[in-house]
Amino acid sequence: MLATDKKQEIISTYKLHDSDTGSPEVQIAILTERITYLTEHFKTHKKDHHSRRGLLKIVGQRRGLLDYLKKKDVERYRSIIEKLGIRR
C-alpha cells in the first residue's frame, strides 16, 4: 500500500490545479506507483497469487483510465504516458 506522504507527493506532481486529487492523470500516476510496488513484491514472493489477482485488477483500472484520457484528450494522454514511462 502507498504511504500517505508518497501519495501526496504524486498528487502534487501530477495535479492540474490546486485542489486536484481525482483527475485521470493523478489517478493513473497513483495506480502506476501501486503497480510498481506490487511488481517488486512479486520478485520475492512468487507464489502470492492472491495479490497477483489484485495487481491484474489495478492494471485493468489504469487501462480504463488511459483509454478514457486517450478518447477525451490525446495530448494529455501522450504527456502522461511519457512522464510515467508507460510502454505503449
From Swiss-Prot:
It comes from the Bacteria. Gene3D superfamilies: 6.10.250.3130, S15/NS1, RNA-binding (1.10.287.10). It holds the Pfam family Ribosomal_S15. One of its GO terms (biological process) is translation. GO terms for cellular component: cytosolic small ribosomal subunit. Keywords: Ribonucleoprotein, Ribosomal protein, RNA-binding, rRNA-binding. One of its GO terms (molecular function) is structural constituent of ribosome. One of the primary rRNA binding proteins, it binds directly to 16S rRNA where it helps nucleate assembly of the platform of the 30S subunit by binding and bridging several RNA helices of the 16S rRNA. Part of the 30S ribosomal subunit. Forms a bridge to the 50S subunit in the 70S ribosome, contacting the 23S rRNA. Belongs to the universal ribosomal protein uS15 family. PANTHER family: RIBOSOMAL PROTEIN S15, BACTERIAL AND ORGANELLAR (PTHR23321), SMALL RIBOSOMAL SUBUNIT PROTEIN US15M (PTHR23321:SF26). NCBIfam families: S15_bact (TIGR00952). This is Small ribosomal subunit protein uS15. It comes from Geotalea uraniireducens (strain Rf4) (Geobacter uraniireducens). The lineage of its organism: Bacteria, Pseudomonadati, Thermodesulfobacteriota, Desulfuromonadia, Geobacterales. The gene is rpsO.
